[in-house]
């Protein structure tokens, strides 16, 4: 199964250099976001795609991501870092362990 990357130019180039050949670049313009939504729908329907990596900023602009078992859709930080940071980590710990971690 293939790993696919969707994101900004810098992130996509990095993953191409790491060996991911199926990569799609999108900026955050309205037209590009619509193209990204369509590409994501297309990728989710393919049988040969196992993991879709998508930058957090692009995923946020797309809105609701498909809720599917396969392919696995993973949000990754871009060159500016995570937009979720501690909040996401707290939620993951809360779900996994059943307790809320606070400072």
UniProtKB/Swiss-Prot annotation:
Key words of the record: ATP synthesis, Cell membrane, Hydrogen ion transport, Ion transport, Membrane, Transport
Subcellular location(s) per record: Cell membrane
Signal sequence extent: none
Alphabetized SUPFAM superfamilies for the sequence: AtpF-like (SSF159468)
Disulphide bridges, residue numbers: none
Topology with respect to the bilayer: Peripheral membrane protein
Major subcellular site: membrane
Superkingdom, taxonomy of origin: Archaea
InterPro entries: ATPase_V1-cplx_f_g_su, ATPase_V1-cplx_fsu_bac/arc, ATPase_V1_fsu_sf
GO-annotated molecular function: ATP binding; proton-transporting ATP synthase activity, rotational mechanism; proton-transporting ATPase activity, rotational mechanism
A GO BP annotation: proton motive force-driven plasma membrane ATP synthesis
Record's GO cellular component terms: plasma membrane
NCBIfam families: PRK03957.1 (NF003047)
Cited function: Component of the A-type ATP synthase that produces ATP from ADP in the presence of a proton gradient across the membrane.
Subunit field text: Has multiple subunits with at least A(3), B(3), C, D, E, F, H, I and proteolipid K(x).
Record family assignment: Belongs to the V-ATPase F subunit family.
HAMAP family listed in its UniProt record: ATP_synth_F_arch
Protein's name in the database: A-type ATP synthase subunit F
Natural source organism: Pyrococcus horikoshii (strain ATCC 700860 / DSM 12428 / JCM 9974 / NBRC 100139 / OT-3)
Protein's gene: atpF
